Amino acid sequence: MIKIRLKRYGKKNRPTYRIVLIESQKPRDSKTIEELGHYDPLLKQANFKFDEIMKRVGQGARLTSRVRYILKQFS
């Protein structure tokens, strides 16, 4: 199953996340299929390709609860 979820990067105690399309059984920081945006929780900023995310959801990708929350908050 393909999921749209967060991939952590950044520094210790200073996380930033990429919103990525990835196989659900792979580890969080493994190779992704596609990068769809990014999210900075400390600055409360998010940039993402909303049209591309909706296209992938239409093709059967599932959103994690955290990504769904980010999309609702910043759309």
From Swiss-Prot:
Keywords: Chloroplast, Plastid, Ribonucleoprotein, Ribosomal protein. GO terms for biological process: mitochondrial translation. The keyword Ribonucleoprotein applies. InterPro entries: Ribosomal_bS16, Ribosomal_bS16_CS, Ribosomal_bS16_dom_sf. GO terms for molecular function: structural constituent of ribosome. It is found in: Plastid, Chloroplast. Transmembrane segments: none annotated. Belongs to the bacterial ribosomal protein bS16 family. This is Small ribosomal subunit protein bS16c. It comes from Cyanidium caldarium.
